């Protein structure tokens, strides 16, 4: 046996036994609605994995606050929309709202983080008005 490979081979069974984190991502953010509809803000999550993702106890933190209740499952290829004001959202979109978040997304920039039930970061998005965000993202 090659002695340089030995440390890697010892760690191999451990690495193979660690389950992969679900691939749920923050897919889309609508943070800057017209002034008269500031509560139209929403966040879309997507599960691109071939398996459903149990997102029970997962939270959105930093810019907004939301926690998924027990028995929350995002199907394979599925989407869920969370909004600041589900009633206002329903006036403009046909999609069903999966929950209402607290606080507001910053109009000129913010960070949104998705953490699992153990507090581990699953995905994080930071946005703002500068590059690489196009000016048209602000409705200009």
Residue ranges and their predicted role:
Residues 7-17:
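Bacterial N-terminal signal peptides
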